[in-house]
Amino acid sequence: MALFKKKTTLVHHITYMGIMAAINLIFILLATFVPPLMFILILLLPFASTVVAYYCLKRYYIIYAVATVGLCFLCSFNIGDTIFYVVPAIASGFVLGVLLEQKIHPFWMLLSCTVINAALTYAFIPLVNLISKTDIVLSLLTIFNLQDFLYKTELVYLFIFLISLAQCGLSIFIIISDAKKIGIQINTRINSFWPYIIGLEASIALSVGFALFYMPLALVFLCVSFYFAAFLLVDLIFSKKLLIYILSGVLVLAIIFVFAIFYKSLKEPYGIELSVIFPLAIGVVSFLKNILFKYPVNI
């Protein structure tokens, strides 16, 4: 049975899911004896789940999910960690596999899977704290020596979002790097940048809005705005339009000037929210570029 090939029979599906679950089990056992290896499992689990979701029929995925969760619990005897780390990774891996099958652009795949992974992790925090009788977030921050950080409460959601981004990003990177070898077609065609510009402006608006009453989510949406901005910046760099380069340079100088003047006038940690002007400027330039120049590209 070819490892990276669509499965056609029930036996193939069960065998394939068993192989992937066994690979997960190996990492689980290693992580049990060497706890730092748990992070390798956390990073690789979405990839294994994505491969299963892509090559197997979706109705059989629940078998793989239940088997993986069960093995994690039986080997670690920690239902809290299993719910907090493993379940979101399995769910986001399934979504990534479906999006791959639908030939969605990697940008949207990464964003969708990250949001789902992070949202499930957020949602499970109260349940995990209740089951384990410990503060799972504080335990996670302690691993990175951030337990005494002054603004740790404001950074918790952003921290989880970035971990989810790393998880899903690694899975997508591996898939894109070996796409031809494993028989997966990646869609990199972009016919319009307007959805990206709209997404950027929406994330900026949400970041500014939440900053008024709930800073943790404001920082998450600030991070999302930088995600959109980084993608649009690549397009601006490859536009090879002198007017765009000049406009970008002028805006960069203006942003640095504005940031330097107003940053200290804002109370910590709200000063960081002022960095929203960076993605905002990129959005403005991208907006003008897409009005003046229209062409489909591959990114």
Task: Please tell me what each predicted stretch does.
Residues L29-M38, T68-G97:
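Interfacial aromatic-anchored transmembrane helix boundaries in multi-pass membrane proteins
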Residues G18-A21, V87-P126, S265:
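Short helix-perturbing small/polar motifs within transmembrane alpha-helices
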